[in-house]
């Protein structure tokens, strides 16, 4: 309900026909309220105020201002149309006087003097009123004693106590805890205070509208009735003896800020409630002793499991009490804070729509990775960071084949015997047939070929040859053993057993993502495709099979991670290359799927050349497919493929500037990437100076400018210390990651040793920047890295401050970026205002080469750039 003017007292009211005139205008307030008076001559101007189909006969005192009339109009709206009022109504209305003699019937009232006796004044809503204004209607909360059990309409929990258990809104009648008052959105409907538009404000009788049929109201009545509708304020010390306490909801400015936030699906987890709680979707009690319902991990929304699918995607992120703290209250790091990470997530089941547990430990083992010798300083060489997973798994419900198998590989010629279990996604090598602990997983998506035995060079002397080979990108597995035990026996040997495994694996390598899921005996198999959502044109189609729109290549794996596998594909009609991210609901129940949903919800709200484009999404009962544009490679491949294992400064400036521009767009939308690393910076082409785009928003969070979060996210090697120390973080988290990316791009190593304190390492310049290779890198680059790798968040550079750093404000970089914008046909990195500055820079430096000759200004790096371009084109 709208906050009406705070000074309604003294507002005039309309006289009624036949009422005796008062002795003077000053005595109007002293008369009984039930005896309204007709004003004496000279005491004011009487006229009608019309709002829609409602008219009120009012009196404007002499020497009144236009503000007086607006206050009166707001009071009428608050009483007769409370559901139409909103915060700031006074500043959003215009007054027009009806003038039948003019060609323009409505004349704008600019001052109170424009209103004459008997005029009809129309109240019109200004065009400056926005949709957000209509959504802000503060509650009028008073302490209330309930005679029957009641529940809070904000958190769903029961209002406990014998008397004065909670707060009731006088406008809409909803009930709240006192502790929830600050969190209550200003969305009062005003249903309890609404009056019929045909009812006069001064009378309880219903009357028909007429030119003078409305009974007048005294100023005292109008003041009292209007005050009843205003949001309450806490009583002052002078009124401490009052029997009622008054409360207001959360600040209006907070509501305006929250309306601009991107809304995402709720993160539901199964929850056990210790207090009686109602479902906030259906308003019915959550019954049971434990695991009664679902609770959103971020906003604490409660609902039944059956109601989860009907809950709108309107989560605004973590509530203030659950992690967002004002920036000025955030403390710097102390030794006491450096404790081990605590696991925030429950071990209970998770339902669709929930975010996955974020693994934050280094990989426990990597078969096939050659150990690179570290330098004497103990620097960690740059590599693709692999998130660790617990080496346990549940038995798949779609097991295709299982049994004991003997095997060895080209990396390890020692024969091993494990219990293999093949399902539709991978081959799992278990320690035995009764445990869920496994030795290794071989994803089917990584198997390039299954060939008969042909390479016998690695067969140990005196042993039997293998039966067939499983070839992956890094490892070749030699499976089976020709003579020996019975087929399929516990020894894992035998030609027949090996032949059966070879056939089963070949069948599993077929495009299973396009096949129908195996159905139970007696059940009719159903179609995979059920729903298609097009992001580009917002079209939703049912019963659309993804195979009819896109050709997916299961053997073209573009990447894999915690959130699924990305396959290459092609649009059937246009031949356009695409990337398809797949989540298997059956194998990965809701964890990775929920992160994917969060990524889709965020990408739907983003349209920027520096962010990967989301085309559409398909969902089936078993899988979720997200179709995105296919890019050439990632920034990590570019770094690793360079001749020296690091990038030249010129190219690093070019790439970092693009990353910062994309981050600026994200932060403007209050979105923090939270997992920025070279693997998530994709290259659009094989050019030596390519366009880059940010991807993988599975960890992304919606964080306000002065808000903090505490959820554990991201990849440890690129994470800021506030996350690793389980403290609140904000959008500066991404800026730390940019500093790490700069460091690894210029040096080819990670900046920190995980065994030593980050503070000590940063303060030790000799450790952070050894002579090789940093003696060949400019001091400007080191200065920018130092300002990004600040442990104290308030000292860390922002996006705009980083873009303004002298190291990035370089003429050659500007030329490279302008050339890229010319190829793209869109100017989104540089700005027109920079043109004059750089033109002046060229004119002042007469020795500066022309634009076409600037490529020769960096001769030491040109050889590197040429070699790098050749390697990128091969990737």
From Swiss-Prot:
GO terms for cellular component: cytoplasm; cytosol; Golgi apparatus; nucleoplasm; nucleus; plasma membrane. Residues 1-33, 224-247 are annotated as: Disordered. PANTHER family: PROTEIN KINASE C, MU, SERINE_THREONINE-PROTEIN KINASE D2. Residues 398-510 form the PH domain. The lineage of its organism: Eukaryota, Metazoa, Chordata, Craniata, Vertebrata. The modification Phosphoserine is found at residues 26, 30, 197-198, 200, 203, 206, 211-212, 214, 244-245, 519, 707, 711, 873. GO terms for molecular function: ATP binding; diacylglycerol-dependent serine/threonine kinase activity; protein kinase activity; protein kinase C binding; protein serine kinase activity; protein serine/threonine kinase activity; zinc ion binding. The modification Phosphotyrosine is found at residues 87, 408, 439, 718. Residues 14-24 have a biased composition (Pro residues). Serine/threonine-protein kinase that converts transient diacylglycerol (DAG) signals into prolonged physiological effects downstream of PKC, and is involved in the regulation of cell proliferation via MAPK1/3 (ERK1/2) signaling, oxidative stress-induced NF-kappa-B activation, inhibition of HDAC7 transcriptional repression, signaling downstream of T-cell antigen receptor (TCR) and cytokine production, and plays a role in Golgi membrane trafficking, angiogenesis, secretory granule release and cell adhesion. Pfam families: C1_1, PH, Pkinase. Its EC number is 2.7.11.13. Belongs to the protein kinase superfamily. CAMK Ser/Thr protein kinase family. PKD subfamily. Its cofactor is Mg(2+). This is Serine/threonine-protein kinase D2. The keyword Glycosyltransferase does not apply. Residues 236-245 have a biased composition (Low complexity). Interacts (via C-terminus) with LCK. Interacts (via N-terminus and zing-finger domain 1 and 2) with PRKCD in response to oxidative stress; the interaction is independent of PRKD2 tyrosine phosphorylation. It catalyses: L-seryl-[protein] + ATP = O-phospho-L-seryl-[protein] + ADP + H(+); L-threonyl-[protein] + ATP = O-phospho-L-threonyl-[protein] + ADP + H(+).
């Amino acid at each position: 309900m709208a906050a009406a003017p705070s000074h309604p007292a003294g507002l005039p009211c309309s006289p009624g026909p036949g009422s005796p005139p008062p002795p003077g205008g000053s005595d109007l307030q002293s008369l009984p309220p039930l005896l309204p008076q007709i004003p004496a001559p000279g005491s004011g101007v009487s006229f009608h105020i019309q709002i829609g189909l409602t008219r009120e006969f009012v009196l404007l005192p002499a020497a009144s201002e236009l503000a007086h009339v607006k206050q009166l109009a707001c009071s009428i709206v608050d009483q007769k149309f409370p559901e139409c009022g909103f915060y700031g109504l006074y500043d959003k209305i215009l007054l027009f006087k009806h003038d039948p003699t003019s060609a323009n019937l409505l004349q704008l009232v600019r001052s109170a003097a424009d209103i004459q006796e008997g005029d009809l004044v129309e109240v019109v809503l200004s065009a400056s009123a926005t949709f957000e204004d209509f959504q802000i209607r503060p509650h009028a909360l008073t302490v209330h004693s309930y005679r029957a059990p009641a529940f809070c309409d904000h958190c769903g929990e029961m209002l406990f106590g014998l008397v004065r258990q909670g707060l009731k809104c006088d406008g809409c009648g909803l009930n709240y805890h006192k502790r929830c008052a600050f969190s209550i959105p200003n969305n009062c409907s005003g249903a309890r205070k609404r009056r019929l538009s045909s009812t006069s404000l001064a009378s309880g009788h219903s009357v028909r509208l007429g030119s003078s049929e409305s009974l007048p109201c005294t100023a005292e009545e109008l003041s009292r009735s209007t005050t009843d509708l205003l949001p309450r304020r806490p009583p002052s010390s002078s009124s401490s003896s009052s029997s009622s306490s008054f409360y207001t909801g959360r600040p209006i400015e907070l509501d305006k800020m929250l309306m601009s936030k991107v809304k995402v699906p709720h993160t539901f987890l199964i929850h056990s409630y210790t207090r009686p709680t109602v479902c906030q979707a259906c308003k019915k009690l959550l019954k049971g002793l434990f695991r009664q319902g679902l609770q959103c991990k971020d906003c604490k929304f409660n609902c039944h499991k059956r109601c989860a699918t009907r809950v709108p995607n309107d989560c605004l992120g973590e509530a203030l009490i659950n992690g967002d703290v004002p920036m000025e209250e955030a403390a710097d790091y102390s030794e006491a804070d450096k404790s081990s990470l605590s696991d925030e997530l429950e071990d209970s089941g998770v339902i669709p729509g929930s975010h996955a547990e974020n693994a934050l430990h280094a990989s426990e083992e990597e078969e096939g990775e050659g150990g690179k010798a570290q330098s004497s300083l103990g620097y960690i060489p740059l590599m693709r960071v692999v998130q660790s997973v617990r080496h346990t798994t549940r038995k798949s419900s779609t097991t295709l084949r299982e049994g004991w198998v003997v095997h060895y590989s080209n990396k390890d010629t020692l024969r091993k015997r494990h219990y293999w279990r093949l399902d539709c996604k991978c081959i799992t090598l278990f320690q035995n047939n009764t445990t869920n602990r496994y030795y290794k997983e071989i994803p089917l998506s990584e198997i390039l070929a299954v060939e008969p035995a042909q390479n016998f060079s690695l067969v140990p002397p005196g042993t039997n040859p293998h039966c067939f080979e499983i070839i992956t990108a890094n490892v070749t597995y030699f499976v089976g053993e020709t003579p020996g035990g019975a087929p399929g026996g516990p020894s894992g040997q035998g030609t027949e057993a090996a032949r059966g495994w070879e056939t089963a694996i070949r069948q599993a390598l077929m495009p299973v993502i396009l096949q129908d899921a195996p159905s139970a005996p007696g059940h009719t198999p159903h179609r995979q495709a059920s729903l298609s959502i097009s992001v580009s044109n917002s079209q939703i189609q049912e019963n659309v099979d993804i195979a009819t729109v896109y050709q997916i290549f299961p053997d073209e794996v573009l990447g894999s991670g915690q959130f699924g596998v990305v396959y290459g594909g092609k649009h059937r009609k246009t031949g356009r290359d695409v990337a398809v991210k797949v989540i298997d609901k059956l194998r990965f129940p809701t964890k990775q799927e929920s992160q994917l949903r969060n990524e889709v919800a965020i990408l739907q709200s983003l349209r920027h050349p520096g962010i990967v484009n989301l085309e559409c999404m398909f969902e089936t009962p078993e899988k979720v497919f997200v179709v995105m544009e296919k890019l050439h490679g990632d920034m990590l491949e570019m770094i690793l493929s360079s001749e020296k294992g690091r990038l030249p400064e010129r190219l690093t400036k070019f790439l970092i500037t693009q990353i910062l521009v994309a981050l600026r767009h994200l932060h403007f939308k209050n979105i923090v990437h939270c997992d920025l690393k070279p693997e998530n910076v994709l290259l659009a082409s094989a050019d030596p100076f390519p366009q880059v785009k940010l991807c993988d928003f599975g960890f992304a969070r919606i964080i306000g400018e002065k808000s903090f979060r505490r959820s554990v996210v991201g990849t440890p090697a690129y994470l800021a210390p506030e996350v690793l120390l389980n403290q609140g973080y904000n959008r500066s988290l991404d800026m730390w990651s940019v500093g790490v990316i700069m460091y690894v791009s210029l040096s080819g190593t990670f900046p920190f040793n995980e065994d030593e304190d980050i503070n000590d390492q940063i303060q030790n310049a000799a450790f952070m920047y050894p002579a090789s290779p940093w003696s060949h890198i400019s001091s400007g680059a080191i200065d920018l890295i130092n300002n990004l790798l600040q442990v104290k968040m308030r000292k860390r550079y922002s996006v705009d401050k980083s873009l303004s750093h002298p190291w990035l404000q370089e003429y050659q970089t500007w030329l490279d970026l302008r050339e890229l914008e010319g190829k793209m046909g869109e100017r989104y990195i540089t700005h027109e205002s920079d043109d004059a500055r750089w033109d002046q820079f060229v004119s002042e430096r007469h020795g500066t080469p022309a634009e076409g000759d600037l490529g020769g200004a960096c001769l030491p790096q040109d050889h590197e750039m040429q070699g790098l371009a050749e390697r990128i084109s091969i990737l």
